[in-house]
Every structure is written in structure tokens, then in C-alpha cells.
Amino acid sequence: MKNFLKKNSSNFFYFLAYLKVKFKSFNGKFQYTFFKQLNLFSKQSIFKNKINQKILFFSARQDKPQLVFNKIIDFALQVRGNETLTIGCDGDIRKSCNYGASPKIDYFSCKECKEFSSKTHSISKSNIYWLSELYNTNDLIESQKIISQFDDKDLPSVFYKGYHIGEFVRVSINHFLKVNKIDLEDNNTVKIYRDFLQASVRQINSFDKFLEKHKPDKVFMLNGLFAAERMMFEVARSKNIHVITYEIGYRPETFFLWHNNPINMCCNDYWNEFKNIKLSDIQNNKLDKYIDERYQGKGLILNYFPNMQKDISLISKKFNIDFNKKTFLLFPNLTWDSTLYNIDLFFNSHSNWIVETIEYFINRPQDQLIIRCHPS
């Protein structure tokens, strides 16, 4: 029922989700466990005097798991004597939010997000600043005026105050439109591109002022490639402020963390340090268990394969697979995944790679191509 509603009546689905968050925010008996834990923790006198560093949490994307993770790190830093402050989204970037899809994020989805985050920061007594509070009407007018000067075809080349914002927003627009290539002949695409660029101009100005005023020692954020985070990342880097980016890992309760770069989940920089180190028996057992879990379709954050077919004979019959032929496998990603950013090296695009590969094998009846689609 949940998936049916979300697919066929998204407005009503997100309205119900918003009501659920509203109810569980204020009703003590049915309140989220996370809120109850926050209440208990916030009342304890375990926070030291703020004598160490000042850490800024940039939380433009604040779905529940990200917000919970941020708050755990936030409290851990405060316990160790650090001062923390947070920039959160109060709906300011609804037209350019990566949790939305063309033409903009659903109204009640945005309201649900704001409700949960505002309650979280209220209970935990966060030092919170909302995005819309960081600029005024004049900033909004200026951003519209600046971006309106550019022709549609020139949007990818837009620079503002030395920042290549036309490039920085590309990952977000691909994700927002669920495309691999941005079509500047399409009116809706151009409108969305301009929305992201206008938001970027406002953010660069407001983030610059904020960092100058508060002077954090470090900035902690999700990913670092998507639009709002990318603007904060670049402005902070221009001021030599240390930035830590993170992403949820492939296994449950694991994370990737990166320093002074947008997240890179395919990094081999440290391989030379570990390649000659022999695994212990415990590590070998853990690795064997993990490989077995993956073989069974488990060991992931989401259960992509609740009803996985394991009978090879049935699979081969269904898809006409002939094991006497030489077999080639293709593993495409989602075409708008941020991990594909700037790695179109040998083909014009991710989609072009798939199409050309299929066309090649059409003319090779002695071989067969199996395409394993991304489970998302």
C-alpha cells in the first residue's frame, strides 16, 4: 500500500507522512524513539566547556538517518569540549533540493523534512541557523538579475566570483531530472538549471558572510558534490577551512569520510599501505561471511532482493541464456548517480556506453551479453 500510494498519489502520500511526523513530534507516548533519547541526553550535564574547536555542521539535506548521524557526531564533539553550530534547511531550496525531482520537491515532503529537523534541533538545543535567514530580499533579486544575463546555452559556463557554479550544479541537475545528459533545448531543464544557479549565487554570498562572522575551524557535510553542499565546500576551501565530507557506506552502520574533497567512494589511494598486509583469521572469516552475504543478496543497507531467484535453470530459461556461448556481463549504474561525475572517459555518456555495447553484441550471435541492471 505504501509503495502504491507513493507511486500513484505522491501528494497524498507525503501529506500523510507529514502528519505522521507532526503527530510523533508532540505526542509523548508515540514520540519517535530518537526524540526520547535526545530529551534524556540533552538533560545530562556531560558537555564540557567549549575550549577546543568550533565545528560547523552543514545540513542542507536532512532526511532522518542523516540528521540522526549528524546529531550523534555533534554530541560526541561537544562532550569532548568542542563548540558546534548547524546550518539547516527550512524549505529555502525546495526548487533546488536533491531530495526532489523535476519540477521541484513535493510541498509536504519538504514540510515533513522541516518538521523533523526543527524538532530535532529544538530538543537538542542546537545552535541552529536556517538557510533562509542567511540572506535578504535584495540577495534574491540580485541572484535573479545575475543569472538572467546568461543565454541558455551558456549556463554550464557560468562563473560567479571565481566559482564555476555552472559546473558545480551539474551533478544536482542530473539527479533532479534523473538524466545522464542535460538538454539545454528543453525549457523545463533550462528553468531548473536557472533555479539551481540563482540559489548558488545566494548561497555563495551568504556562506561567505557566515564563515567570516563565525569562523569555524572545520565544516562537516554530506557528500560535497551536490549543489548547496558544493557551494559551502568551495567557499570554505577558499578560506582554508578544513572540510570533512561523508557518505553512508556499502554495509549497514558504516561510513565513508573524506578530508578537503568531495566524497570519493572508489578511491585506491591507500591500497599500497594495505596490499601486502596479510589478513588475520578473524578478518578472513569476516570477509568470507560478507562475500557470502552479498552472494545471497544480503549485507546491504537496503534489502534489494527480498525474493531473489536462485535457481539457475529457471533464470537461464526465463532469459534464454545459453551457457555454451561465450558470455559477457554489463553492470550499468543509475545514469544520474554522483559517482559517475566526470568519469565519461571513453564514451560520450553512460547511456551511450550501454547503447553502443548492445549494438556491438547484436552483430555477434556467437556471443551473448547479460545486462545486470542496478537494483535501485
What do these predicted regions represent?
Residues Q296-S376:
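Conserved catalytic-core segment of nucleotide-activated headgroup transferases in glycan assembly
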Residues N49-D63, D217-F220, F328-P332:
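Short hydrophobic beta-strand segments
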Residues M1-F58, A76-V201, I248-M308:
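Conserved N-terminal ligand/cofactor-binding loop architecture of enzyme catalytic domains
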Residues S59-F69, M221, S338-D344:
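A short, glycine/small-residue-rich beta-strand->loop->alpha-helix junction that serves as a flexible
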Residues Q203-W258:
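Conserved nucleotide-sugar donor-interacting segment of glycosyltransferase catalytic cores
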Residues K64-T86, D90, F233, S349-I362:
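Histidine-anchored nucleotide/phosphate-binding helix
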Residues R61-K64, G91-R94, G224-A227, G249-P252, ...:
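Short, solvent-exposed loop/turn segments at secondary-structure junctions
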